[in-house]
Amino acid sequence: MSQPNPANTQEITQAATILSSVEKHLDRFVVGQGRLRETLALGLLTGGHLLLESVPGLAKTTAAAALAGAVGGEFARIQCTPDLLPSDIIGSQIYNSSTGRFEIQLGPVHANIVLLDEINRSSAKTQSAMLEAMQEKQTTIGGTRFDLPSPFLVMATQNPIEQEGTYQLPEAQLDRFMIKDVLDYPGPAEELEILRRLDAGVFDIDSPPEPACTLEDVRTLQRYARSIYIDPAISRYLVEIVSATRQASRYIGPLAQFIECGASPRASIAFTNASRALAMIRGRNYVIPVSYTHLTLPTKA
C-alpha cells in the first residue's frame, strides 16, 4: 500500500517537535502512564477512537481533558448512567415559546475530544447513539445533519465488566474503537510523585498552561501520518495477521476457544492507521513489521 508522496524528513521533524510539546503539556497533569500517553498520541494522529478499561481513579478523565487543553480543542465529558438518553449526547430540538419555533440544541458530542465516562453503565440504546458520530463524524437531529468538528476523537472509559451496574458493549460498538487498552495502577514511585505534585500545587487549574499546539497543527499531523509509507509486503503481512483471527483453530489450536469472533476489515484499517502513526511517533517515515507486533493486542482487543 505505497504512498505517492511519502512524508519527508522535514515533516517528520516538524511532527516530532509538535508531539514533544504535547507530551510536555500532558506531563504536567499525568504522572507515569506511558502506555496511556502513547495511546492518546495514536488516537490524536489517526482520529481513531479509544476504549480505556480500568478501575476508577487512574487519570483517564484527567488525561482526556489535558489532551484537549494541549491542542487548544473543545473538551466535553459525558457521564454515562442507566438513565442517560441519546438526546443527552447528540442534542435535540427545543421549543422556543417566544418565537413559536423549534430550535436545535447541539449535544456535548459536538466537541473535539469527547470523553464517554463509564460507557458500559449506559443502556445499549444510548450506546448506539454514538455509532453515527463515531463512524460518520456527524449527527442527525430532527432530520438535519450536523458535521462534527475536526479533529474529532472519542475516548470511552469502562469499568471491568464484573463490577456491579455494568452492561456488555455490543460488538457493533466495540468495532468502532481503534484501540482498547487496559490500564494498570501506578507504581509506588509514581504515586509518591503524584502526592509531591499535589502538595506543590502543580495540579491547580486556576492557571492552566497555554496550548502546546493548535487544531490546525493536529490536522497537519494527521495528514502527515496518512502519508507514512507501507511496503506492499508489510500490508500482506498485516492481512495474514487479521485473517488468522478468522481461522483461529488452524493457527492456534486449543487457544481458538478464546476467540469469539474474528477481526473485521475495520481492524485491518485500524492496524494500518495505527502503525503509520506509531512510525511517526518513533521518528520514521515508513512502517516496519515490529509495529504490528506492538499494536496487535490493543487494536484487536
Which ranges hold each PLM region?
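Canonical AAA+ ATPase core
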Residues: 96-99, 134-213, 220-226, 276-278
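Loop/turn-to-beta-strand initiation segments
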Residues: 48-49, 111-112, 149-155
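Pre-Walker A (pre-P-loop) alpha-helix and adjacent loop at the N terminus of AAA/AAA+ ATPase modules
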Residues: 16-49
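Conserved AAA+/SF3 P-loop NTPase catalytic/coupling segment centered on the Walker-B
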Residues: 111-134, 167-171, 188-191
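AAA+ ATPase "lid" subdomain C-terminal helix
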Residues: 230, 243-250, 271-287
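Walker A/P-loop
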Residues: 45-80
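Conserved alpha-helical scaffold flanking the Walker A/P-loop in AAA+ ATPase domains
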Residues: 96-114
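Conserved small/polar residues in nucleotide/adenosyl-binding loops
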Residues: 293-299
